[in-house]
């Protein structure tokens, strides 16, 4: 028995009365909220309207879930369509089985539809949500822990994952927690994108491409450690080949885009009132209110000064009038004396 290890949950579902709350789905939901929340902050900082990220996510998230499931079912079709299998299980997404490659690809289609409806460029939106997607994946990977799936080779390290379920044909034991490795890697990718965006002012989809490239590096390494059944090409797992191909495409996009359109977009959302301060700068939500207060105070001071000047002029005129009356009386008396 290992002295130290990561225990697996006794079950992957909790019941709130008759309603099942599955750990896998719960992790995905948390990830979506984190991605939308962070993406919204970055979008507003770039000059967009609050709420735009969420509006487009309404399109991107369902498309992404469908794409992720399709990729999994197509690449592991024997789990659902081979002899003795029930094809209906292909629709049971809550039992696990989402391919990130399909989720990103079809999710991008949904995001493109949402962006066209709002009249904004897809690359700018993708840059805003890129680190949030990485953090969302970090949360989502814990769903594999709840389902006791997608772990690595057998090991005796202190952080080994104790697998108690044998539903996938594996012998219960201690294995590399690849879900944890990928979760930590995704956290690092998220912070890398934020730092690089702040340092190099990434725009026109380059922040998103950096996220894709960085994720592929970690995924290729972690995929090599996994021992679950997978298709192989030339002795290499299919997902490794996919990671290599997507990595090269992402790097190529960064290079070509930097030459063709350096810098960031000047306007990310036409008609937005706030031009933004940059994705790396904090958004001063009270700036407009402070400006309005200052303008009001200035107008009040100007009005007060004008009133005082008017009153001062009026008093001077009255004083001049009062001084003129005695003078006129004195002159009249002098003329009378001369006549006498």
Swiss-Prot record:
Pathway assignment: Protein modification; lipoprotein biosynthesis (diacylglyceryl transfer)
Main location as per UniProt: membrane
GO molecular function, one term: phosphatidylglycerol-prolipoprotein diacylglyceryl transferase activity
Protein name from the UniProt record: Phosphatidylglycerol--prolipoprotein diacylglyceryl transferase
Bilayer-crossing regions: 19-39, 54-74, 93-113, 119-139, 176-196, 202-221, 238-258
UniProt keyword terms in alphabetical order: Cell membrane, Membrane, Transferase, Transmembrane, Transmembrane helix
Stretch list, region Disordered: 266-340
Annotated EC: 2.5.1.145
Residues reported in the UniProt entry to bind a 1,2-diacyl-sn-glycero-3-phospho-(1'-sn-glycerol): 141
Biased composition (Low complexity): 295-307
Membrane topology: Multi-pass membrane protein
A cellular component term, taken from the record's GO annotations: plasma membrane
Stored NCBIfam families: lgt
EC top class, as a word: transferase
Gene field: lgt
Pfam family, one: LGT
Family as reported in the entry's similarity comment: Belongs to the Lgt family.
């Amino acid at each position: 028995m290992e002295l130290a290890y990561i225990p697996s949950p006794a079950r992957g579902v909790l019941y709130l009365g008759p309603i099942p709350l599955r750990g896998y789905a719960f992790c995905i939901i948390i990830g979506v909220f984190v991605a939308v929340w962070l993406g919204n902050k970055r979008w507003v900082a770039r000059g967009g309207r609050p709420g735009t990220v969420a509006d487009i996510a309404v399109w991107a998230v369902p498309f992404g879930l469908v794409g992720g499931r399709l990729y999994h079912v197509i690449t592991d079709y024997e789990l659902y369509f081979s002899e003795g299998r029930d094809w209906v299980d292909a629709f049971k997404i809550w039992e696990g089985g989402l391919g990130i490659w399909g989720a990103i690809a079809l999710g991008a289609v949904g995001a493109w539809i949402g962006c066209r409806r709002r009249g904004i460029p897809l690359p700018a939106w993708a840059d805003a949500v890129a680190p949030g997607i990485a953090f969302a994946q970090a949360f989502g990977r814990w769903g594999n822990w709840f389902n006791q799936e997608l772990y690595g080779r057998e090991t005796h390290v202190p952080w080994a994952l104790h697998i108690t379920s044998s539903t996938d044909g594996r012998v219960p034991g201690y294995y590399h927690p690849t879900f944890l490795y990928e979760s930590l890697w995704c956290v690092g990718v998220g912070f890398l994108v934020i730092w690089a965006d702040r340092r190099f002012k990434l725009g026109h989809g380059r922040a998103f491409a950096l996220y894709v490239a960085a994720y592929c590096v970690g995924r290729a390494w972690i995929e090599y450690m996994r021992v679950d059944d997978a298709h192989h090409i030339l002795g290499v797992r299919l997902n490794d080949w996919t990671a290599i191909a997507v990595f090269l495409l992402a790097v190529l996009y960064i290079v070509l885009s930097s030459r063709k359109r350096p810098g960031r977009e000047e306007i990310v959302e036409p008609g937005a009132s706030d031009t933004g301060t940059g994705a790396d700068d904090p958004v001063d939500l009270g700036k407009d209110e402070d400006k309005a207060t200052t303008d009001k105070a200035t107008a009040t001071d100007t009005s007060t000064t004008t009133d005082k000047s008017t009153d001062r002029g009026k008093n001077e005129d009255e004083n001049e009038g009062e001084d003129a009356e005695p003078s006129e009386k004195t002159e009249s008396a002098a003329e009378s004396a001369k006549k006498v």
